């Protein structure tokens, strides 16, 4: 109810794996539809081991609008391609809009995944999503850029305003800021303490929120090019604009500088 009151048009369930809470999803997607909003579930498609199991799952979700299937070479080590294909085919039979997010590190990953799922391109949307930074043996393969050396190449687009709500009720201005726990630079509050419309209204008045929404990651790079941290940042590599924001603004000292910068601008 608070989502609709806040003017939110679409609600997306992510995990973990949301289909583990299938009965709850049935209730939530029904209410979302009643309130005139759009619903999406992001899933690994593990419930599609057979077409029958896929049908049983989707029969419980008649009000679901969109299904985002997230897959990559890593997922396929645990979830067979046929399981993913079953989920796609049954979802199409039930009239769902199907989007497949293929996460990749190298271009070869895209080629491999398209060999498996490319035949669906005329029936679903297939999106290539660059892997976000992570810790692990393959982390060094992620392509990164020295954005401070070429600030004009820094992305200006930002996902701020696509609010992320955790299972505990914490509200963040975007997904990436949910790991910004050192400074809570875009933590908006908690639904158990305040209503969502009030949290969003307060967020729109915060200088940090307004600056990032207007200028995006490119504006953050611009701000720090005039800082005492300029030299150390010149050699740093970032995989995305989101990582720029999270790495710099979740550092207490750099965040303090940033606050002073935007107040003086």
Segments from the language model and where they lie:
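Well-ordered, non-membrane alpha-helical segments in soluble/globular domains
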Residues: 1, 55, 81-87, 108-114
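Structural recognition of alpha->loop->beta junctions
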Residues: 54-76, 113-133
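Flexible mid-to-C-terminal extensions adjoining Fe-S/redox cofactors in radical SAM and related proteins
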Residues: 181-265
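Acidic (Asp/Glu)-rich catalytic clusters
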Residues: 2-5, 29-34, 56-64, 86-93
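Core AdoMet radical
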Residues: 8-21, 35-52, 61-83, 97-105
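A C-terminal junction/extension of Radical SAM enzymes
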Residues: 99, 105-180, 215-230, 239
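Short alpha-helix within the catalytic core of nucleotide-sugar-dependent glycosyltransferases
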Residues: 25-26
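Conserved, mostly hydrophobic/aromatic
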Residues: 69, 169, 196
